[in-house]
Amino acid sequence: PEYIESFIKDLTGRYKFNAIYFDDDTFNIGNRHTEKMSEVMSKFDIPWFAMCRADTSKKETWKKMADSGCKGVKLGVESGSQVVVDKIVNKHLDLKYVQEIVSHIRSLDMSVHGTFTYGLPGETKEDMIRTKKFIKDTEFSTIQESGTAEIEGTPLHALIHEEKLTTYPGAIADENYDRQKDGGKKWQSLVKELQNN
């Protein structure tokens, strides 16, 4: 936190930054760290935002973030299907809790941006429809939806091109998996498919 404080002081003083976004998907892993960062940010009269995980902070910690000037968070939910979140994404994030915490965060006058991806290996059309329903039933301020991309060096790329994963021996790319490498094009084709249902 001391380094971050001097860094932000430099950004706001020398470079006249008037807002900060912490693009760190481990920003709120642990209440103590998040609360210390909130203490640091309360020393600056600027709005700030952070990428967070929905289930790693207590409700009191979200309140401390809001009180210190946090105006919004980005939550990577990935899917509205519990099976996809648990078995495919391997995130083990309770979607009912996500809905509860999104509502809580919004009650603190913070925005919540939810991110979702479609077209994962093993994900069914029904899973994608569940995701659309989950988004509709949750109080996100904004959302981001994208198609899964096979980025070289990732486990997904290895799964598709080597047809196995040594670290996840049960992983398979089933015959329904769309092998489109461009996430944007994949998303467009999935949207058309979902609109027909």
Language-model segment annotations:
Residues 12-26:
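Active-site groove signature of glycoside hydrolases
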Residues 1-9, 14-16:
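Acidic, low-complexity intrinsically disordered segments
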Residues 6, 26, 30-31, 36-197:
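A structural motif corresponding to the C-terminal lobe/cap of the Radical SAM core domain
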